[in-house]
From Swiss-Prot:
InterPro entries membership: Enolase-ppase_E1, ENOPH1_eukaryotes, HAD-like_sf, HAD_sf
GO biological processes: L-methionine salvage from methylthioadenosine
Recorded metabolic or biological pathway in which this protein acts: Amino-acid biosynthesis; L-methionine biosynthesis via salvage pathway; L-methionine from S-methyl-5-thio-alpha-D-ribose 1-phosphate: step 3/6; Amino-acid biosynthesis; L-methionine biosynthesis via salvage pathway; L-methionine from S-methyl-5-thio-alpha-D-ribose 1-phosphate: step 4/6
Subunit note: Monomer.
Species of the source: Fusarium vanettenii (strain ATCC MYA-4622 / CBS 123669 / FGSC 9596 / NRRL 45880 / 77-13-4)
GO cellular component, one term: cytoplasm
Entry cofactors: Mg(2+)
Annotated protein name in UniProt: Enolase-phosphatase E1
Function text: Bifunctional enzyme that catalyzes the enolization of 2,3-diketo-5-methylthiopentyl-1-phosphate (DK-MTP-1-P) into the intermediate 2-hydroxy-3-keto-5-methylthiopentenyl-1-phosphate (HK-MTPenyl-1-P), which is then dephosphorylated to form the acireductone 1,2-dihydroxy-3-keto-5-methylthiopentene (DHK-MTPene).
C-alpha cells in the first residue's frame, strides 16, 4: 500500500519502529544513557542544571544517588515509559549527539517522503513517548543528507503535553492544538503500534500501522492490520 499525499493535510509520525529502527532505541540510545549515567551523577548531582531532572523523580529516589541510579536502571529494564525518565534520558543523550557518537538511523524512505510532503504543503507532526527535547535531538542529528530534519517538522508531542499514546484523548489534544485543520479526515497518524493506531482512529482521524524490519508482528485478526504499509511512498493512484 502507498500513500496519496493529496488526501492529507497533516501527517503525524511515531518514531520508534516507524521512522527509525526499534533497535536504535533499544540497542543504542538506552544503553548509552545508562553508560553515561554514573559519570553524570558523580559530576552533576548537586548542580542546578541537573537538579530539574533529579527533582522530577519521586521523593524516595531523588535524595539518594545510589537509589536514584538503581531506580533509573530498573525503569529502563522494564521499559517503563514515564515522563521523568524520558526527560533524564534526553539530557544524557545530548552530549552523545553533540559529539557525533549518536546519529539517528532513519529509514531511507523517511527523508524523501518528509521533503515531498512539506514541498506539497503538508504539516508534519511527531508524537512519541520520548520527550520533546529528545525528539528534537534525534531529528537534528540524523543520517539523512542534511542531518538536521527539524526544519521540516511543524510540531512535537509526547506523553507530557499530549498524554499516553494508547489513549484516545491524547490524539484529541493534538488535534485541538491545530484548530486550523478542522477536517479530521485529512489527518493521518502512522505508527508500528496497533493500539496507538486504534486510539487515533477512535479520536476521528485516519491511521494506518507501519511494518518495518525488527518490529513485532501485527495481530492478524485486527482489521487495521490489512491497511499496513511497509514504506513511506507517495502515489497519486493510492
Amino acid at each position: 500500500m502507498t500513500l496519496n499525499l493529496a488526501e492529507y493535510d497533516v501527517l503525524v509520525f511515531d518514531i520508534e519502529g516507524t521512522v527509525c529502527p526499534i533497535s536504535f532505541v533499544k540497542d543504542v540510545l538506552f544503553p548509552y544513557a545508562l553508560e553515561a549515567l554514573p559519570k553524570v551523577l558523580d559530576q552533576e548531582w548537586d548542580s542546578p542544571e541537573f537538579a530539574k531532572y533529579r527533582d522530577a523523580f519521586p521523593e524516595e529516589y531523588r535524595n539518594s544517588r545510589p537509589d536514584f541510579e538503581a531506580h533509573v536502571r530498573d525503569l529502563v529494564k522494564r521499559d517503563v515509559k514515564i515522563a521523568y525518565l524520558k526527560s533524564l534520558q534526553g539530557y544524557l543523550w545530548l552530549q552523545g549527539y553533540k559529539s557525533g557518537d549518536i546519529v539517528a538511523p532513519l529509514f531511507p524512505d523517511v527523508d524523501p517522503f518528509f521533503n515531498q510532503a512539506v514541498k506539497d504543503g503538508k504539516k508534519i507532526i511527531i508524537y512519541s513517548s520520548g520527550s520533546v527535547p529528545a525528539q528534537k535531538l534525534l531529528f537534528s542529528h540524523t543520517n539523512s543528507e542534511k542531518s538536521d530534519m527539524t526544519p521540516l517538522i511543524a510540531d512535537y508531542f509526547d506523553t507530557t503535553n499530549a498524554g499516553p499514546k494508547t489513549e484516545v484523548d491524547s490524539y484529541r489534544k493534538i488535534i485541538s492544538s491545530h484548530p486550523e485543520h478542522k477536517d479530521l479526515g485529512r489527518w493521518l497518524f502512522l505508527s508500528d503500534n496497533i493500539h496507538e493506531v486504534s486510539a487515533a482512529v477512535e479520536a476521528g482521524i485516519r491511521s494506518v500501522p507501519v511494518i518495518r524490519d525488527g518490529n513485532a508482528p501485527l495481530p492478524p485478526d485486527n482489521s487495521l492490520t490489512k491497511l499496513a504499509i511497509s514504506e513511506f511512498k507517495h502515489s497519486e493512484d493510492a
